C-alpha cells in the first residue's frame, strides 16, 4: 500500500563571508547542495534504487521548468503542498554521481523569511523529500522503495535522517569564520515583531 515517504538530509550553513550571497534574478537568496542520495540505506532504513530517482528527477525537472517546484517549511504528512506555507522554490536539479543536487531560491513569504533568518544565523535545518510509495523489506532493517514511488516536493524541516549531506548559501568572496550563536526564539521574535506588534506575546 502506498504511503507518504519523508526523507531528510542535514542542511548546514557556510561561514560568514565578506560579500553577499549570490541571488536569483528576483533578488532572493539561493542555497544549493545535496537533495537526495541513491543506492544507499538512509537514516530511516530505506533504500532508493538509482533508476527510481532518475525517473522521478526527470519528471520533477519538468515541474522546475514550469516554475511550480515549491516546498514548505515544516512539511505535513500530506500529499498536498499548502501555498500559505511555501518557503522556497527549486530552480535546478542535477546529478553528481549517486547524489541528486539542487539549487533552491528562498522566497520572501512568511515561512521563507523565517527560513532565511535561520540559515543566516547558522541554525541547522534539514532538507526533506516528500513522496508517495510502497516499501518492500530487502533484509533485516532495510526497506526498498518500490516502483510506484512518486516524488512530490522537497521541504525544509528540523530533524535530519541522512547524516553527511548538507546544503549551503551560494556565495562568493573571502570567508570570515564565525562562532556566533543565536537562539531560534530570538530570530523568530525579530521576524514576527518587525512591524511593531508581537503576536507571540
Locations of regions flagged by a protein language model:
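Residue microenvironments linked to proteolytic maturation
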Residues: 3-5, 10-12, 72, 88-185
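Short acidic DE-rich linear segments
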Residues: 191-201
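Polar/acidic, low-complexity leader/linker segments enriched in S/T/G and N/D
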Residues: 1-63, 176-184, 197
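Glycine-rich loop at the start of a catalytic domain that most often binds anionic cofactors/ligands
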Residues: 85
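A short, polar/proline- and glycine-enriched secondary-structure boundary/capping micro-motif
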Residues: 44-45, 82, 112-116
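Short conserved beta-strand and strand-loop elements enriched in small hydrophobics
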Residues: 61-80, 127
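Noncatalytic, helix-rich "gating/capping" subdomain that lines the substrate-entry/channel surface
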Residues: 184-192
